Amino acid sequence: MSLAEQLDSSLRYQPFGSVWYGEEDAELLERLLSFYPRKPPERILDATVNGGRFWRGTRRKVIGLDIDPRHQPAVCGDNAVMPFRSGCFEVVVYDPPHIPNQGRDRSKDFNTRFGLGDRSTKEHGYSFAHTYPAFMAEAYRVLEDEGVLFCKIADYVHNHRYQWAHIELIHAGQKTGFTACDCIIKVRKGPIIDPNWKVAHHTRREHCYWIIFRKSHRCE
């Protein structure tokens, strides 16, 4: 490589930090799509599209899948049994619910805000971790080799017990055959706080994670 090529390469390199500050995911997701795929992706699946907030203002062509027809997704279906042929996507995006149930406050629509279409019961530890393996198997199937899976995941405290959702997700991905390649910590402006809370036993969550998996034995 010539000196000119080396200089040009160094000028093109833009550092991508592991901590992201901001409320919106759309800009961060655009950075992920520009940074991790081997080539500019054209076949993208959002497997938990909900109202499509990740893609507002984007020019990318994205197929949205959701189990709830009220969100009017392009494809209505279960991401644990996807209606797609194997190896047809370059990127899959996944944002599972992390809050186990609506609670008593019915003034807020948790389905729209958090994708909460179903409850998680005591049998499952008030967690959705039991849904990760089936999704991971399907994501692995529909991704092409070297394809990338972007997962947004938040840990949760329920009944004074910390639920390590991001660790459960990583384990599920690795058992399926994915390589967990990177992690972005997304920090919000402030924690979610209920004015009725009087006593705290854990710190309040001000962050979530974007975990990057690749359908490969290597990351680079």
Regions found by a protein language model. Give the residues of each.
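Class I S-adenosyl-L-methionine-dependent methyltransferase catalytic core
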Residues: 1-220
